[in-house]
Amino acid sequence: MNSSFLYHAWGLYSLECTREEYKGNTIILHVQSKKPQKTCPKCGKCNLVKNGYRTRDFLGLPIGGKKIIIRMKVQRYKCKCDGCDYDQQENIPFATGSCSYTHRFAKHVVDLLRSMTLKDAAARLDISWDMVKEIHSRYLESHYSPPSLDGVECMSQNYYLFIINNFDYLLKIW
């Protein structure tokens, strides 16, 4: 598959697609890094060697009603310099940490939630309700801060009286 299409459709830059699989309503794209890492990010020397790999699956933006799974071969690298203990996997630019979805997929979920419920978005994308809730929670945490309580005095030392009204019958309840 063309690298330009990978970049513009799913935001996968510096990756190449080695093959595609079509299984039912799912397209699986097998990708890997174009260039291997050459220098150690810790010591700066060119003594990195490949130290195995791991295959990870990520949910990508759906195309034409088909579910997209991006299957990436994530390479581990180890530094052979004396005194350097670098042993990590390569950076994954299109996903955060241990998430199983891409940044663009998360943005798509948030856009869907502007017009539908969590349950409807999960059913439309064929993912679990918990994943939709996790994506939405991360979005809310990153874009909104918790309310400030600067004007509220310490409530444990004072007694506050609240009046609760029932406006349907115009009665004071408390």
Label the predicted regions.
Residues 29, 40-43, 79, 109, ...:
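Mobile genetic element proteins and their domesticated derivatives, centered on retroelements
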